[in-house]
A protein has these predicted regions:
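Penicillin-recognizing serine hydrolase domain
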Residues: 226-246, 339-487
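Exported/periplasmic cell-wall-interacting domains
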Residues: 7-53, 57, 95, 133-137, ...
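Active-site-adjacent loops and short helices of periplasmic peptidoglycan-processing enzymes
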Residues: 227-376, 384-387
Length: 537
């Protein structure tokens, strides 16, 4: 693709240089207009010729080409700019057995048997997007069946309940213990998928324990939209210095992998684990419940979050010391609230449900070297959080958060980085320095893009991430590869001067006065020897 941000920057610089030249020469030559115009012609000709030549000689290639590594990485496998994608898990019903597919965009639940569509039901309510209780997308299975289940949170009966993960069920319309129906309300539930009671009863009778449940909760990207735009490199020869063992840059919206090195290599991830801990807690821990901090929760090494034995704190409030100060005590408290073993199993189940098939977790803190993942899987996690649990990303970028006697301070190195949208960093001896961050970057001509940057096995995550950010801002472009909007400056012909303005040229007040005095306010006279400029609109 030839459309690049670089030419527009050059044009703006040209405007500034020319404006400065005009100002300087007018002040120097005063009313001596002949000397003034001659100097302008000389300066403009030299400047524009250089700009045109530089733009013309730039090599323009697509991002799909291999990019050189740093000198330090020459002996290693080079990273590549790649146009692969990590999309939402593509759905196909099981060829043998039963499958439940829920589309929370169209609000439909469909049943399949041996790969064939059986029936489609209308979904009446789902968890509110962006809230604690947003219905989680992913791949699950029916865990339990109850003809009626009493919600410990809402204190209502949920008829014909099918539990598929943590506190989430598919069920009929709820009713109070008095027998009165639950009000219709806004169409949002506490996270469960509500059907009419009649439909839920029919689904309940058809469903078996372990029946697959596939839930789609993300706005679809049309294939044509993805093909219309793409990522391109401006200068293929420009080097990117990254010392991390593995890294990846991906577009959150399209799923495109832009840059990567060893992105499928399984590595320990340290406290990046806490993003999965936070995500799992929203699904399996009752929110806004009080938990008492027990002494054994505080025995784990590392950051404490200033939690004290015996104090009571809301389960939802523990997200803040967990993500802002990387509190290991907060992670252990959340896990032990419902049973540590069950919580860790739920972390692994959640990872599998959202497509993190090469990840496994052994604790809720990241201290264990057995908490492993890949850059690709962590990109999937970032994409899932951005599309389904924005609340967690918002929490992770708060500078401070106060609750009761506690004030937690964000220790992220990237908090003041332009465009930072949230994430988590970590460190252990086996993992070295790690980071998952989402950044909103101006790599498109008209719109910023949310890009996930994952760095694993780094000796300096801040430097590696900053180098990647600088490279993206200066050398990667996202746009539409169409010839009719291609920007191209031909080489200047001998004795020919051309100039393209990307905007207005702001002149000093003294220049305006001189033009009014000497040229009766006709600014085109400044360029009288340059007919193309003088006659231009």
């Amino acid at each position: 693709m030839i459309v690049k941000r670089f030419p527009y920057i050059i044009i703006c610089l040209a405007s500034i240089i020319i404006g400065a030249t005009i100002t300087f020469t007018l002040l120097r030559y005063g009313a001596n207009t002949e000397a003034f115009v001659g100097n302008v012609k000389s300066q403009v000709s030299h400047t524009v010729s250089s700009i045109a030549s530089n733009i013309t000689n730039r090599d323009k290639k697509e991002v799909s080409a291999e990019i050189p590594t740093t000198e330090a990485d020459v002996e290693e496998e080079p990273f590549r700019i790649t146009l692969g994608t990590i999309d939402d898990i593509s759905f196909a019903p099981d060829e043998i057995g039963k499958t439940i597919r829920v589309n929370l965009e169209t609000m439909e639940l469909s049943t399949y048997e041996n790969g064939t569509l059986q029936k489609t039901y209308k979904v009446l309510a789902k968890g509110k997007p962006g809230s604690y209780w947003e219905t989680p997308g992913g791949e699950y299975q029916v865990l339990t069946k109850e003809e009626r289940h009493l919600s410990s949170v809402g204190k209502v009966w949920m008829p014909y309940s099918l539990q598929f993960f943590g506190n989430f069920f598919i069920h009929g319309w709820p009713y109070y213990q008095s027998g009165e129906d639950f009000p219709v309300g806004s169409g949002y539930s506490g996270g469960c998928i509500r059907l009419s009671t009649e439909d839920a009863e029919e689904l309940y009778g058809w469903t078996d324990i372990t029946t697959r449940v596939s839930i789609y909760s993300t706005k679809q990207i049309n294939e044509s939209d993805v093909k219309e735009n793409g990522y391109f490199v401006i200068d293929p020869k420009k080097k990117l210095s990254v010392g991390a063992t593995s890294f990846l840059v991906g577009d959150i919206e399209t799923g495109e992998i832009i840059l990567e090195k060893n992105s499928d290599k399984e590595l320990p991830i340290a406290s990046v684990t806490k993003l999965m801990t936070a995500l799992t807690s929203l699904d399996v821990v009752s929110q806004r419940k009080e938990v008492t901090i027990l002494p054994q929760y505080l025995e784990v090494q590392g950051q404490s979050g200033d939690l004290r034995a015996g104090e009571k704190i809301g389960t939802n409030d523990l997200i803040y010391p967990l993500l802002l100060e990387s509190s290991n005590d907060a992670g252990e408290t959340l896990a032990n609230f419902i049973g540590r073993g069950y919580f860790i199993k739920s972390m692994n189940d959640k990872a599998q449900a959202i497509g993190m098939t090469n990840s496994s977790f052994a604790d809720p803190t990241g201290l264990s070297k057995d908490n492993i993942s890949t850059s690709q899987d962590l990109f999937r996690l970032a994409k899932y959080l951005k599309e389904n649990k924005q609340f967690l990303l918002d929490a992770s970028k708060e500078k401070t958060h106060t609750e009761g006697s506690h004030t937690w301070y964000n220790t992220s190195q990237f908090l003041n980085t332009d465009g930072y949208e949230g994430g988590k960093r970590g460190y252990t001896d086996p993992a070295r320095e790690t980071n998952l961050g989402i950044f909103n970057l101006p790599v498109s001509e008209f719109h910023d893009r949310s890009l996930a940057i994952v760095v694993l096995g780094s000796e300096d995550r801040y430097r590696d991430t900053k180098n990647i950010l600088d490279y993206l801002r200066s050398n990667i472009y996202f746009g539409d590869d169409k010839s009719d909007i291609t920007f191209y400056v031909p080489p200047p012909a001998p004795k020919d001067t051309t100039l393209v303005f990307g905007g207005d040229v702001m002149l000093d007040r003294g220049v305006k006065t001189s033009v009014e005095k000497n040229f009766a306010g006709d600014f085109s006279q400044l360029f009288s020897p340059l007919t193309k400029l003088k006659d231009a609109d």
